[in-house]
Curated annotation (Swiss-Prot):
This is Small ribosomal subunit protein uS2. The gene is RPS0. It is found in: Cytoplasm. Residues 256-291 are annotated as: Disordered. One of its GO terms (biological process) is ribosomal small subunit assembly. It comes from the Eukaryota. PROSITE patterns: RIBOSOMAL_S2_2 (PS00963). Component of the small ribosomal subunit. Mature ribosomes consist of a small (40S) and a large (60S) subunit. The 40S subunit contains about 33 different proteins and 1 molecule of RNA (18S). The 60S subunit contains about 49 different proteins and 3 molecules of RNA (25S, 5.8S and 5S). Interacts with RPS21. Pfam families: 40S_SA_C, Ribosomal_S2. Keywords: Cytoplasm, Ribonucleoprotein, Ribosomal protein. The keyword Transmembrane helix does not apply.
Length: 291
C-alpha cells in the first residue's frame, strides 16, 4: 500500500481499513480504464483488478474537505440511479443536509429551468459515472464540479474527483457513503474529534431488498407449524402415543358401560313381518288403456 500524503490527523485507522477490506471495496472489475491505472495495486491471476485502499481513503478525505468547504449543505446534490446506492444517498442527505436524487435522473434538471425538478447545485456526487452519465453530462454544461465513486472500468470524463472503489457491491457502496458522511461531520465540527465514535451504524447505508424483507416479516408473523406443535407436545410429555392410549381406553370404557340393544328379541322374524308383494299388473286400474 502506498504511503499516505495526508497529515497524520487524517490517517486511516486500522478499523477503517478493515471495514474497507471486509466490504470488498478493493475488488474492481476485470477491465481497466486508463485513467484509473494510478489507483491500481495489482491484478490477480483470475483477472480481477485490486484497488489500492490507501488511495481510496485519501480520496474520501479529499472529497469530504471539498464538501465541508461549501457553506450551504443544500447546494450539494447526491445522485444514485443504481438501486444499491439509493438508500445510501438518502441517508447521506439526511445526515449532511444535502439534496438527494434517488432513482431516475430527470433529463434537464440542471439545464432546463422550465422543469419542476430544476436545480442549481454547486457540487454533485454520483454513485456510478456509467449509470449517472446524464447528470455528469449536464453538470459539465453548467460548470458544476463532480465527485464520483469510480470502479476500475468507470469512465472518468468530466469527473473532477474520483474515489476509487467497488461501486457495484451494496456493502462497498454503503460503506464509502458512510465514511464520507462521517468525515464531513468531523470537518464541520458535529463530531468532536476523530476519536469520537459516530452513533450511526453503517448498516443503515446498506441496500435492503424489499421482497426479502417482506418475506422475512411474513415468516416471523405466521402461526406455529406442525413441527412446533409436535415439539410442544413432547415438552409436555403427552405425545402421539399418549393420545392413542388415552383414546383406546376411553372407547373401551364406553363399550363396557353401554351394551348394544337386542335386535333379535325386539325385531322378530323379518320374513314373517313383511307383507307379500303383489304383482304390478294387479295394481293397474281396470279402465286404463294399453298403448
Amino acid at each position: 500500500m502506498a504511503p499516505s500524503n495526508l497529515p497524520p490527523v487524517f490517517n486511516a485507522t486500522s478499523q477503517d481499513i478493515e471495514m474497507l477490506l471486509a466490504a470488498q471495496c478493493h475488488l474492481g472489475s476485470k477491465n481497466l480504464q486508463v485513467h484509473m491505472e494510478p489507483y491500481l495495486w495489482k491484478t490477480r491471476p483470475d483477472g480481477i483488478n485490486v484497488i489500492n485502499i490507501g488511495k481510496t481513503w485519501e480520496k474520501i478525505v479529499l472529497a469530504a474537505r471539498i464538501i465541508a468547504a461549501i457553506d450551504n449543505p443544500a447546494d450539494i446534490c447526491v445522485i444514485s440511479a443504481r438501486p444499491y446506492g439509493q438508500r445510501a444517498v438518502l441517508k447521506f442527505a439526511a445526515h449532511t443536509g444535502a439534496v438527494a436524487i434517488a432513482g431516475r435522473f430527470t433529463p434537464g434538471s440542471f439545464t432546463n429551468y422550465i422543469t419542476r425538478s430544476f436545480k442549481e447545485p454547486r457540487l454533485i456526487i454520483v454513485t456510478d459515472p456509467r449509470t449517472d452519465s446524464q447528470a455528469i453530462k449536464e453538470a459539465s454544461y453548467v460548470n458544476i464540479p463532480v465527485i464520483a465513486l469510480c470502479d476500475t472500468d468507470s469512465p472518468t470524463e468530466f469527473v473532477d474527483v474520483a474515489i476509487p472503489t467497488n461501486n457495484k457491491g451494496r456493502h462497498a457502496i454503503g460503506l464509502v457513503w458512510w465514511l464520507l458522511a462521517r468525515e464531513v461531520l468531523r470537518l464541520r465540527g458535529t463530531l468532536a474529534n476523530r476519536e469520537t465514535e459516530w452513533d450511526v451504524v453503517v448498516d443503515l447505508y446498506f441496500y435492503r431488498d424489499p421482497e426479502a424483507e417482506e418475506a422475512k416479516e411474513l415468516e416471523e408473523a405466521k402461526a406455529p407449524g406442525v413441527e412446533e406443535i409436535g415439539a410442544a407436545a413432547v415438552e409436555t410429555g403427552f405425545g402421539a402415543e399418549g393420545w392413542e392410549a388415552a383414546g383406546g381406553s376411553a372407547f373401551a370404557a364406553a363399550a363396557s358401560t353401554t351394551a348394544p340393544p337386542n335386535w333379535e328379541a325386539t325385531g322378530g322374524d323379518w320374513a314373517t313381518s313383511t307383507a307379500p308383494a303383489e304383482g304390478w299388473a294387479g295394481d293397474a286400474p281396470a279402465g286404463e288403456t294399453k298403448w
